[in-house]
Regions:
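Asp-box/WD-like beta-propeller blade repeats and closely related beta-sheet repeat scaffolds
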Residues: 74-77, 88-113, 122-128, 134, ...
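Short glycine/acidic-enriched loop and turn motifs that connect beta-strands
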Residues: 19-23, 66-71, 124-130
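Entry beta-strands of beta-propeller and related beta-repeat scaffolds
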Residues: 10-15, 57-62, 115-120
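Beta-propeller blade signature
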Residues: 26-30, 74-86, 132-147
Length: 168
């Protein structure tokens, strides 16, 4: 998903869309009748767009960068926090995450509960013993008050872990 529509407190709307030709985010504002009232361009943080999320007080953008050299020191995922006027507040990033291509072959879903943002997305992983770069899920947890990553899961899960088991 590269385009997001969100309702604003005054009944108007804001559309956020990633655009590779504009090298960032296009933000469009619409009145309650969907007449365009303004636009803004927000420069991108990292070159690969993942997702956008709006809370009551802030906007968040998740971006990434390819890491085909399998460099554990390279920032591959970045979560950037903005105020409601699109002024950058801060960001936090994830390195050493078994990722060559963030957001590859899937989507980026984001939700917030309390102080915690959960990002569930995907990636192409480092080359495995069979010589392939497999695709898998990624989960990142961020304390959005401190803008610190508090947990992440980027490794291969045992096949049995991906099934729902029950006794019956």
């Amino acid at each position: 998903m590269k385009s997001y529509l969100t309702a604003l407190d005054d009944g108007s709307f804001m559309r956020v869309q990633y655009g590779s030709k504009i090298n960032g985010l296009l933000v469009e504002y619409y009145d309650k009748d969907f007449n365009l009232t303004g636009t803004k361009i927000i420069g991108k943080e990292l070159p690969v767009f993942g997702g956008f999320y709006a809370t009551k007080d802030n906007y968040y953008v998740v971006t990434g960068e390819n890491n085909t050299d399998e460099d554990n020191t390279k920032e591959v995922y970045r979560i950037t926090k903005y105020d409601k006027h699109w002024n950058k507040i801060t960001s936090t990033g994830l390195t050493n995450c078994n990722t060559t291509k963030p957001f590859n072959a899937g989507s980026c879903r984001i939700d917030v509960s309390g102080n915690y943002m959960i990002i569930h997305t995907c990636h192409e992983m480092y080359k495995s013993d069979d010589g392939y770069n497999h695709q898998a899920n990624v989960t990142i947890q961020v304390d959005i008050d401190k803008m610190k990553i508090t947990d992440s899961y980027t490794v291969v899960m045992d096949q049995r872990g991906s099934r729902i088991l029950h006794n019956g």
